[in-house]
């Protein structure tokens, strides 16, 4: 394979990995530990 192909696949895989990690953190089990600043703020 050419270097550009390997580099492109590596960058695409990294972006997919970051996206999956962000979705897991936002909607998966770790989301229970996140606080909602709008619920914490009292008027």
UniProtKB/Swiss-Prot annotation:
Record keywords, A-Z: Membrane, Thylakoid, Transmembrane, Transmembrane helix
* Domain of life assignment: Bacteria
Q: What is its main location?
A: membrane
Q: Please cite one Gene Ontology biological process associated with this protein.
A: photosynthesis
Keyword Repeat tagged: no
Give the species: Microcystis aeruginosa (strain NIES-843 / IAM M-2473)
Q: Name one GO cellular component term.
A: plasma membrane-derived thylakoid membrane
Which subcellular locations apply to this protein? Cellular thylakoid membrane
Q: What is the lineage of its organism?
A: Bacteria, Bacillati, Cyanobacteriota, Cyanophyceae, Oscillatoriophycideae
Topological relation to the membrane, as annotated: Single-pass membrane protein
The UniProt similarity line reads:
Belongs to the PsbN family.
The name on file for this protein is Protein PsbN 2
Provide the function of this protein: May play a role in photosystem I and II biogenesis.
Mind telling me which residue stretches traverse the membrane in this protein?
A: 4-24
The encoding gene is: psbN2
